[in-house]
From Swiss-Prot:
Protein family (similarity comment): Belongs to the QueC family.
Pfam family, any one: QueC
Record protein name field: 7-cyano-7-deazaguanine synthase
Pathway: Purine metabolism; 7-cyano-7-deazaguanine biosynthesis
Enzyme nomenclature, EC number: 6.3.4.20
TM region(s), chain numbering: none
Note on cofactor: Binds 1 zinc ion per subunit.
InterPro entries xrefs: QueC, Rossmann-like_a/b/a_fold
Name of the top EC class for this enzyme: ligase
Higher taxonomy: Bacteria, Pseudomonadati, Pseudomonadota, Gammaproteobacteria, Enterobacterales
HAMAP family: QueC (MF_01633)
C-alpha cells in the first residue's frame, strides 16, 4: 500500500497537493501545525478540507514554541503584514525562520510512524516569495539529512516546485477542484478565506495566477501538463 503525508495548511498550494496525492496514493495523511500564527483560522479550514476530501487521518500538532523563537509578522500582532510590493528586495517580514525545517522534520517523523513513503509539501521556487526554505536546494538537503537520521528512505515530494501560480490553478482544475480551491481554501496572511484581503503578498500572487489562468486556460493547462508529465 502506498502512503503519503501531506503538510497541510488549508491554503491553495497544500490543498492542490492533497487533491493530487489522493489520486496517486492509496492512503493519505494530513498534518497541520499550530504555531500561534496570525492567520490561525487556516487550522479550522484545514480540518474541514481534510475531512471533506477524504484524508485517511488529520493531525494538528502544537508547535507554539516556534512562535516564541521566530519573530515575524505572522507570529506577532504588533508587526503589520505588509501590502504587496512587486519591487521589494530581501526576505519579507512574513518569513518565519525555521518553519519549514520544523514542519518537514515533524512530518517525516509522522511518516515514519504510519509507514508512509513520502512527505508532500506545496513549496514552490518558480513564484519565489523570498523565503529561503522554499528552495529546491533546501528541501533536497533536509530530505537527505532526515533520511540519514532515520535510516529510512522517506521521500520529500514538491509537486509545485517548478510550476507557477497560474499552472497551480490549472493543476487544481485538472482534478476538477478549481472552485473548491478558490472558494474554500485560506491563503491570505490576514486570515480571510477564499479570495482573501486582496492586499497582502499571498493574495496578490494567488489572484494574479488565477487571472492569468482564466484568461488563457488552454495554454496554461498545456504548460502545466508538460512540466508535470500529466496527460
Amino acid at each position: 500500500m502506498k502512503r503519503a503525508v501531506v503538510v497541510f495548511s488549508g491554503g491553495q498550494d497544500s490543498t492542490t497537493c492533497l487533491v493530487q496525492a489522493l489520486q496517486q496514493y492509496d492512503e493519505v495523511h494530513c498534518v497541520t501545525f499550530d504555531y500561534g500564527q496570525r492567520h490561525r483560522a487556516e487550522i479550522d479550514v484545514a480540518r474541514e478540507l481534510a475531512l471533506k476530501l477524504g484524508a485517511r487521518a488529520h493531525k494538528v500538532l502544537d508547535v507554539t514554541l516556534l512562535n516564541e523563537l521566530a519573530v515575524s509578522s505572522l507570529t506577532r500582532d504588533s508587526i503589520p503584514v505588509p501590502d504587496y510590493e512587486p519591487e521589494a528586495d530581501g526576505i519579507p517580514n512574513t518569513f518565519v525562520p525555521g518553519r519549514n525545517i520544523l514542519f518537514l522534520t515533524l512530518a517525516a517523523i509522522y511518516a515514519y510512524q504510519v509507514k508512509a513513503e513520502a512527505v508532500i509539501t506545496g513549496v514552490c521556487e518558480t513564484d519565489f516569495s523570498g523565503y529561503p526554505d522554499c528552495r529546491d536546494e533546501f528541501v533536497k538537503a533536509l530530505n537527505h539529512a532526515v533520511s540519514l537520521g532515520m535510516a529510512k528512505d522517506i521521500r520529500f515530494e514538491t509537486p509545485l516546485m517548478w510550476i507557477d501560480k497560474a499552472e497551480t490553478w490549472a493543476l487544481a482544475d485538472y482534478y476538477g477542484k478549481l472552485d473548491l480551491v478558490r472558494n474554500e481554501t485560506l491563503t491570505c496572511y490576514n486570515g480571510i478565506k477564499g479570495d482573501g484581503c486582496g492586499h497582502c503578498a499571498a493574495c496578490n500572487l494567488r489572484a494574479n495566477g488565477l487571472n492569468h489562468y482564466l484568461a488563457d486556460k488552454p495554454t496554461v493547462m498545456a504548460a502545466m501538463k508538460q512540466k508535470t508529465g500529466l496527460r
